[in-house]
Amino acid sequence: MEANQAGSGAGGGGSSGIGGEDGVHFQSYPFDFLEFLNHQRFEPMELYGEHAKAVAALPCTPGPPPQPPPQPPPPQYDYPPQSSFKPKAEAPSSSSSSSSSSSSSSSSSSSSSQAKKMDPPLPPTFGAPPPPLFDAAFPAPQWGIVDLSGHQHLFGNLKRGGPTPGPGVASGLGTPTGTPGPLTTPSQTPPGPAVGAACDPTKDDKGYFRRLKYLMERRFPCGVCQKSFKQSSHLVQHMLVHSGERPYECGICGRTYNHVSSLIRHRRCHKDVPPTPTGGTPQPGPALPSLGLPVSTASATASSDPAAVSSGPSATPATPATSTDGNTTPAAPPGVAMPPSATTGGDGPFACSLCWKVFKKPSHLHQHQIIHTGEKPFSCSVCSKSFNRRESLKRHVKTHSADLLRLPCGICGKVFRDASYLLKHQAAHAAAGTPRPVYPCDLCGKTYSAPQSLLRHKAAHAPPVATEPAKDGAASVPQPPPPFPPGPYLLPADPSTTDEKATAAAAAVVYGAVPVPLLSAHPLLLGGAGNGGAGGPGAGGPSKTFCCGICGRAFGRRETLKRHERIHTGEKPHQCPVCGKRFRESFHLSKHHVVHTRERPYKCELCGKVFGYPQSLTRHRQVHRLQLPCALAGATGLATGQGTTGACGPGAAGTSGGPADLSYACSDCGEHFPDLFHVMSHKEAHMSEKPYGCDACGKTFGFIENLMWHKLVHQAAPERLLAPTPSGPQSSDGGSSGGGTDASSVLDNGLAGEVGTAVAALAGVSGGSEDAGGATVAGSGGGTSSGAERFSCATCGQSFKHFLGLVTHKYVHLVRRTLGCGLCGQSFAGAYDLLLHRRSHRQKRGFRCPVCGKRFWEAALLMRHQRCHTEQRPYRCGVCGRGFLRSWYLRQHRVVHTGERAFKCGVCAKHFAQSSSLAEHRRLHAVARPQRCGACGKTFRYRSNLLEHQRLHLGERAYRCEHCGKGFFYLSSVLRHQRAHEPPRPELRCPACLKAFKDPGYFRKHLAAHQGGRPFRCSSCGEGFANTYGLKKHRLMHKAEGLGMPGTGGSALAGKDP
């Protein structure tokens, strides 16, 4: 009997659901409440009225519970048990309800007979039970005519006055926290106003909407970027953008995200590969590791799961691995390091073991390593040509289909090979006043303005795709879709061109929402696997049913397809209210706002550099991550000396001596050095190429870390990155006495080359409370504590929870602040930082030029600017007498007379007169140019450029003009030649001076000269000009006439003063 009452309480007697009496605030959830209400189903008003009358007739005051008979202890629930509820004695029929499954298995035959009464009880005023209003999964609604009963556990205790639910009406869960708790009796119900027929609905509705308005207000602002949010949980999720944390990890592939919605969206890629727990067979329902855990716990879970480890990207390096989209990724050959397993490390960096190049994702590293191996796994089935990248294969396939896909314009008849170019061409007709052509449907006559819209419409007329019955639980195999009908914008196929190459090349047009395997030989174009196209039986990834009718690209969501189609149509619906610039995506518009506001809320904690976008800050942080000792040790293969704890030992973690106490050895010659900085400087002696150059002095380096340290020389002399910190209790073998595993043991287990794992171990994010891959604890106590601040600064004593936070903080003590502000006394390390700080004391630009109106911060800047309006040239050359505005211009000019080229390139021995010219020249050597011409020895970066160059030696003119048949070597030459065949442009004549122009740009500049003022005047004749360029040309005329200018002596060369 008690079990039945408990089941009744679970069905309708809980007091903490939506219709409960307590006034706890509405719980925070990451979605908009009003958006949720807009997507609910509505029930007929008549049915709700009948049910409301039935519920209102029930008594409002619960009676005392009866004494339960002795029964065995209740079973353990997987969900929170609910409080029992029993009405008054005058309604005996309402005391019985549906029994739970647990009571039917343990009670006597009398209780089993009561379990057969499954219908909900009704008050005695009803002669017959009313018809069922709702399904079992969706009980009667509690808030008007909106059915919210299926989502009561999401809304906590936000209540609205209404009829008290009866025993047969569900009212939510009894324990909002989701943990099992004790049963709640009616005497424990919190006090509140009486509800029922005597309640005032108007007064309670006011309170309800007042609470709803409280929830809709944005009361939680961000302290970094001042963005505000409605709920505190949204603010917590937003702060991950500034901190860079990615706590949600995928249990299958190991990718991490900073929002749970991004992880859920990513999980759709693995929906055909369900996670297999350690039991063997897949379990029904979503498991906790499959939904993603924070990195501190998910990594340990994934590492203990054999199935999860086997699904990582580097589980089977000897065999080709299958990616999430179903395509086969070639395995790395022997000698090439595979990226670290996604279940053991963070999100990077991943270093190449051959060239030490660092990548953020393991897929990028694997794609890069194909360059070293020379492997070309992607081959064309038409001409058997191989490529090392999938994108190169996609571009190559289009060359085979170029003869078939010729799309004519319906207005002028011009033919295009790409539908996107056709749409842009038709937009030019629309801008000129010519209406764009429409595309009618052959079946119903409906017209559309874009061809892809017609293709989606024709999918509705197509018959449904027949499927074969599944065998042994396997997925059903779709039948081949109907052939693609000839569209109104496609030319009919020529029967003479239907050979094997043309048939294979024309294989990829997607018809509506049904993927047609046009390119069956190249399923990579449609994102499928095997030869079955995007939806074939071999596809291991999710089906992409929404395909673009122009380029054939497939998408999994209709919204993504609509956004993609804007690329072809050129539609830009989002416009900037300040400058009027339009964008395709709202995200691009939000990024564009930084141009007008000049806000840079994202600041690097290491160097203080500010950025306007979080992506720029994330890319910038990768530069500093290479300064970590473990990152350097893992990326360059440094060997530690004997008797030390290694690069990742306690010394690096700030628990023992500083870097000077460690001995680092060069892996090439074995020479020992006190710290990593000297090792990196020494290893450059073994390198032949030094691609990183300093823009200030021209010195080159082999590592970008050395270049970063060198740039501090131009500002201040840097101290060491890692200072000694107080050491904690250590064991005799150098490890932590608390029993934790230090990072050196992790490196000894084969992870020394995996930079991402070493960095994650230093940051303390992969070991949970024990931190199996982290560093030892600083301070008192031998054990580790996940909540304590473990790393302390030896200079100021500030402590941090993670080692990365300590390294970030030590930059404050790294540089010497020698330049002080004369107004506030604040010191800075560089002159540029001091200049930026001085501007904060100036409220406005108070120095204005009386000639042109330009404003300046300081009087010295104004005086230098006023030289443009006068004849003053204080810096003159002693050889030719030419005058200059600035001394820097004079130093550059003197090279013309001396002929000195003091800057020499160390690679090709070429000399330059200026250091900036040498720095620009060195960029050519930094980029590899492996393609060499056998005839003249000229090198190129890409093979396509080499093939285009070799046409000069062969005399082949591959590009010909369509009008006159003249041949050219380059495409740019034929495009420039075809302008002569175009009709002459209309002559643009100025209405003020009747001067004619052919170029609209020059015409607009000329009109601006009439409309604006002429602040630049000649001192000889008083004529004014709109810019300095016109004034300079005018001065040359005076020189030729012999009028003379001050200090020139009649020399024509002196007229070239800048």
Curated annotation (Swiss-Prot):
Cross-referenced Pfam families: zf-C2H2, zf-C2H2_6
SMART domains per UniProt: ZnF_C2H2
Record's compositionally biased regions (Gly residues): 8-21
Give the family, as the similarity comment puts it: Belongs to the krueppel C2H2-type zinc-finger protein family.
Q: Which cysteines are joined by disulfide bonds?
A: none
The keyword Amino-acid biosynthesis appears for this protein? no
Where does it live in the cell? Nucleus
Stretches the record annotates as Disordered:
1-24, 58-134, 156-201, 269-342, 459-486, 721-743
> Organism source for this protein?
Mus musculus (Mouse)
Q: From the UniProt record, which GO molecular function terms apply? A: DNA binding; zinc ion binding
List all Low complexity biased stretches.
93-113, 172-187, 294-324
Q: What is this protein called?
A: Zinc finger protein 865
Q: Which GO terms describe its cellular component?
A: nucleus
Listed A to Z, the keywords are: DNA-binding, Isopeptide bond, Metal-binding, Nucleus, Repeat, Transcription, Transcription regulation, Ubl conjugation, Zinc, Zinc-finger
ZnF C2H2-type span:
220-242, 248-270, 350-372, 378-400, 407-429, 439-461, 546-568, 574-596, 602-624, 664-686, 692-714, 791-813, 819-841, 847-869, 875-897, 903-925, 931-953, 959-981, 988-1010, 1016-1038
